[in-house]
Design a protein with these regions (language model features):
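Cleavable N-terminal export/targeting peptides
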Residues: 1-37
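Outer-membrane beta-barrel "beta-signal"
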Residues: 20-26, 101, 189-201
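Short loop/turn motifs that connect adjacent beta-strands in outer-membrane beta-barrel proteins
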Residues: 35-42, 68-69, 87-89, 104-113, ...
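Transmembrane beta-strand segments that form the barrel wall of outer-membrane beta-barrel proteins
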Residues: 39-53, 71-82, 173-181
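Residues that define the transmembrane beta-barrel architecture of outer-membrane proteins
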Residues: 41-43, 54-58, 89-95, 112, ...
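Residues on the lipid-exposed face of transmembrane beta-strands in outer-membrane beta-barrel proteins
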Residues: 60-64, 97-101, 118-122, 155-161, ...
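Flexible, solvent-exposed loop segments that connect beta-strands
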Residues: 77-92, 122-151
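Gram-negative outer-membrane beta-barrel proteins
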Residues: 80-84, 105-107, 124-130, 165, ...
């Protein structure tokens, strides 16, 4: 009897365990992912809340989801600070097209999880440049202030992460850096990043 009960117990346990496994689907197929983000929409509008609260500046973005693994879009940055403000960036207006590659945490909705972004900043810069000079007495320097207005281009790369809920609301953070190509006088490096809230449609 003992030898009969042991195989029976193993059989029942295995069947119950198999039923549990069948009820849990850990990874969705690409077709299911596509259906889910088609239901939510494959376009997204977002706004950077850090720029809005801290600068003030307006940074709005648009993103088009290609598939589960990639997207492209652009964001527009408008600096609302006065150029004399200590908090102001040199960039007054910036249009930033980008292309993203999503990886690791690709989940239900596509275009979600960790990403790497390649971007190109097309920037109009407006700032005051101070040039210091030394006369006969090196202990008494003097300087000239010059208002600079110029246009420049900065390629760059960034990393970040995005979350999407079942209502289509998105939350993301990102940090990236680029380098201006042409001018010798403006800041050589440029920053791109922030914390954004958006909506799929």
């Amino acid at each position: 009897m003992r030898y009969f009960l042991l195989p029976l117990f193993i059989l029942l346990f295995t069947q119950a365990f198999s039923q549990d496994i069948q009820q849990v689907e850990v990874i969705k197929s690409d077709k299911q992912v596509t259906e889910l983000f088609d239901e939510l929409g494959d376009k997204e509008i977002k706004i950077d809340v850090i720029d809005l609260l801290a600068q003030p500046a307006l940074n709005i973005g648009y993103e088009k989801i290609n598939d589960s693994y990639s997207s492209f879009g652009a964001d527009l940055y408008l600096n609302l600070n006065d150029i004399s403000s200590a908090d102001s960036w040199a960039e007054k207006i910036s249009l930033n097209p980008f292309y993203r590659f999503y990886f690791l945490n690709k989940t239900d909705f596509g275009g979600e999880g960790y990403f790497v972004e390649a971007f190109l900043k097309l920037s109009y810069l407006h700032y005051d440049r101070d040039t210091y000079y030394y006369g006969p007495d090196p202990g008494i320097p003097y300087y000239e202030s010059e208002e600079i207005k110029t246009f420049d281009v900065a390629p760059g790369i960034g990393v970040g992460k995005k979350w999407v809920n079942r209502k289509g609301w998105t939350f993301e953070y990102m940090i990236g850096f680029g380098r201006f190509l042409f001018s010798d006088f403006e800041p050589e490096a440029t920053f791109k990043g922030g914390v954004s809230i958006g909506k799929r449609f």
